[in-house]
UniProtKB/Swiss-Prot annotation:
The keyword Transmembrane does not apply. Quinone reductase that provides resistance to thiol-specific stress caused by electrophilic quinones. One of its GO terms (molecular function) is FMN binding. FMN binds at residues 10, 16-18. Homodimer. The keyword Cell inner membrane does not apply. Gene3D superfamilies: 3.40.50.360. The lineage of its organism: Bacteria, Bacillati, Actinomycetota, Actinomycetes, Frankiales. This is FMN-dependent NADH:quinone oxidoreductase. Belongs to the azoreductase type 1 family. It comes from Parafrankia sp. (strain EAN1pec). Keywords: Flavoprotein, FMN, NAD, Oxidoreductase. Coiled coil: none annotated. InterPro entries: Flavodoxin_fold (IPR003680), Flavoprotein-like_sf (IPR029039), FMN-dep_NADH:Q_OxRdtase_AzoR1 (IPR050104), NADH:quinone_OxRdtase_FMN_depd (IPR023048). It comes from the Bacteria.
Length: 211
């Protein structure tokens, strides 16, 4: 049966744009896959451990020789790995924080990128090869060509490389821009741009989930 892994990372439990678009994806997916399995992990409410020496050293130590700290770190990583390995489709929502991504997303990727197991280093070589990956991003402004802060987007480029390292060769980014136009007076003129961007993103998400 189809299995969707749904990852959220926004700190906001309500009103989050990235969560909203990801939920539109999940709702459409459930509608079109009534017998499927959906696993949801919220990295904001249950943050993964950041990479630490117990995990790094424990992964290089035979199981019977691991310290209790190493064994626990490896056990936690195994839970994340099994979630990724058992799914065959993924939707990940990622807001932009300070021109990048939440630290919980980096921590999660550090848990699941394991060379020789889930990662081969290039698209088509890794656990995500042949599986549909959809990344929902929300950005307070716009970093498109010609924008005042063109080149400041350190979110999408990194995430694309990270997921390709996991083998992703069917990946789509759905981005909502100008999310701060509702709260920042300096961006108020772009409210219509934001609303149109969000509406388009939600429809794109629904359509991709149904495909």
């Amino acid at each position: 049966m189809p299995h969707l892994l749904h990852i959220d990372s926004s700190l906001a439990p309500e009103g989050s744009v990235s969560r909203g678009v990801a939920e539109a994806y999940a709702e459409s997916w459930r509608k079109h896959h009534p017998d499927g399995t959906l696993t949801h992990r919220d990295l904001a409410t249950s943050p993964p451990p950041h990479l630490n020496w117990a995990l790094v050293s424990g992964g290089q130590t035979p199981p019977e020789q691991r310290t209790p700290e190493q064994a626990e770190a490896v056990k936690i990583r195994e839970e994340y790995l099994e979630e990724v390995e058992s799914a065959d489709e993924y939707v990940i929502s990622v807001p932009m924080y300070n021109y990048a991504y939440p630290s919980t997303i980096k921590a999660w990727l550090d848990q699941v990128i394991v060379m020789g197991r889930t990662a081969g280093g290039t698209a088509g070589d890794g656990v995500l090869a042949g599986r549909k990956v959809t990344v929902i991003t929300a950005q307070g402004g716009s970093y498109a060509p010609g924008a005042p802060k063109e080149g400041w987007d350190h979110q999408v480029p990194y995430l694309r490389h990270a997921f390709e390292a996991l083998g992703a060769d069917n990946i789509e980014f759905i981005t909502v821009v100008m999310t701060l136009s509702k709260v920042n007076p300096a961006l108020a003129a772009f409210t219509d741009v934001f609303e149109a961007s969000r509406t388009a993103a939600e429809q794109t998400a629904r359509d991709r989930a149904a495909a």
